[in-house]
Amino acid sequence: MREKLEALLSAATAELAHVATEDSLQDLRVKYLGKKGELTAVMKGLGSLSSEERPLIGQIVNKVKTELETRIDAAALQIREAGKAEKLRSERVDVTLPGRRLPVGTRHPITLITEEISDIFAGLGFLVAEGPEIEHDFYNFEALNFPKDHPARDMQDTFFISDTLLLRTHTSPVQVRTMLKQPPPVRIIAPGTVYRCDSDATHSPMFHQIEGLMVDKGITFGDLKGILTNFINQLFGKDTGVRLRPSFFPFTEPSAEVDIACVICKGKGCRVCKNTGWLEILGAGMVDPEVYRHVNYDAEAYTGFAFGMGIERIAMLKYGISDMRLLFENDLRFLKQF
């Protein structure tokens, strides 16, 4: 029995020397130490020994078992370490290689032009004000002197949510909300998203506006012209021609359309300006006293002006964009130009 155990240990040690993987090592462990392994079979034969031999052989069996477990565990550790070393060798990182650059986006042209316009008016003393896009009829129409039968209230022009709630058609409601919150003087611009039922090459059902308001004592139409001329000269160049044409808006009186000399032909006449030499960019006027009545301002003591422009139109003129829909299509070939 002693010789058999020594032979078993020698055979297991010899096989262990050729084991290179964890799977083959596990097979060897099962072969010798498993429930049906060779050492287990020897242990089952202890019962046939005499009472004098059994304790002695039992000690030898335990010693062989312990030795086998120790050698197998050592081999397992060696195999794992060898695997780690191979993985480190095959997967090593060359720190001298250039890094992988992540694609970096650019700011959208609408964002760029909005920030530029806001910066210009900030330099003229205007603050930025904001308001909700889902608006009440009172702020969007009634307080701005839109009669009940005004065409702008028609479903063809306005997205109504209910009888009194709608998607704002301009950012002028922000002006009303501001005047209701604070007394004069007021000097704000209100950039934001607006909605109208319209869609073609020059119109979108969702677009952006910046509207402005200035209310104080002694404000005149000359102040309006001076502010807007200063703004236009900063945005399009100091030599840009400016003209004002009479117009009509429910919430201003008198009202005007503001044109600039065509940025394409410099006022000489071309297809873009329809050979007039001028391009319309915004509407403006003196705040109608009826608006002051809705916000509890004293129309006898205070005057003011308001103006509004479509940001997409300004962007198209500033950057030479021919189709407004390009601003909403998220085409990287287009957006990467800014």
From Swiss-Prot:
<keyword id="KW-0436">Ligase</keyword>
<dbReference type="GO" id="GO:0006432">
    <property type="term" value="P:phenylalanyl-tRNA aminoacylation"/>
</dbReference>
<keyword id="KW-0067">ATP-binding</keyword>
<dbReference type="InterPro" id="IPR004188">
    <property type="entry name" value="Phe-tRNA_ligase_II_N"/>
</dbReference>
<dbReference type="Pfam" id="PF02912">
    <property type="entry name" value="Phe_tRNA-synt_N"/>
</dbReference>
<dbReference type="InterPro" id="IPR002319">
    <property type="entry name" value="Phenylalanyl-tRNA_Synthase"/>
</dbReference>
<dbReference type="Pfam" id="PF01409">
    <property type="entry name" value="tRNA-synt_2d"/>
</dbReference>
<dbReference type="GO" id="GO:0004826">
    <property type="term" value="F:phenylalanine-tRNA ligase activity"/>
</dbReference>
<keyword id="KW-0460">Magnesium</keyword>
<dbReference type="GO" id="GO:0000287">
    <property type="term" value="F:magnesium ion binding"/>
</dbReference>
<comment type="similarity">
    <text>Belongs to the class-II aminoacyl-tRNA synthetase family. Phe-tRNA synthetase alpha subunit type 1 subfamily.</text>
</comment>
<keyword id="KW-0479">Metal-binding</keyword>
<comment type="subunit">
    <text>Tetramer of two alpha and two beta subunits.</text>
</comment>
<dbReference type="InterPro" id="IPR004529">
    <property type="entry name" value="Phe-tRNA-synth_IIc_asu"/>
</dbReference>
<keyword id="KW-0030">Aminoacyl-tRNA synthetase</keyword>
<dbReference type="InterPro" id="IPR010978">
    <property type="entry name" value="tRNA-bd_arm"/>
</dbReference>
<keyword id="KW-0547">Nucleotide-binding</keyword>
<dbReference type="GO" id="GO:0005737">
    <property type="term" value="C:cytoplasm"/>
</dbReference>
<dbReference type="InterPro" id="IPR022911">
    <property type="entry name" value="Phe_tRNA_ligase_alpha1_bac"/>
</dbReference>
<dbReference type="InterPro" id="IPR045864">
    <property type="entry name" value="aa-tRNA-synth_II/BPL/LPL"/>
</dbReference>
<feature type="binding site">
    <location>
        <position position="253"/>
    </location>
    <ligand>
        <name>Mg(2+)</name>
    </ligand>
</feature>
<keyword id="KW-0963">Cytoplasm</keyword>
<dbReference type="GO" id="GO:0000049">
    <property type="term" value="F:tRNA binding"/>
</dbReference>
<dbReference type="InterPro" id="IPR006195">
    <property type="entry name" value="aa-tRNA-synth_II"/>
</dbReference>
<dbReference type="GO" id="GO:0005524">
    <property type="term" value="F:ATP binding"/>
</dbReference>
<keyword id="KW-0648">Protein biosynthesis</keyword>
<protein>
    <recommendedName>
        <fullName>Phenylalanine--tRNA ligase alpha subunit</fullName>
        <ecNumber>6.1.1.20</ecNumber>
    </recommendedName>
</protein>
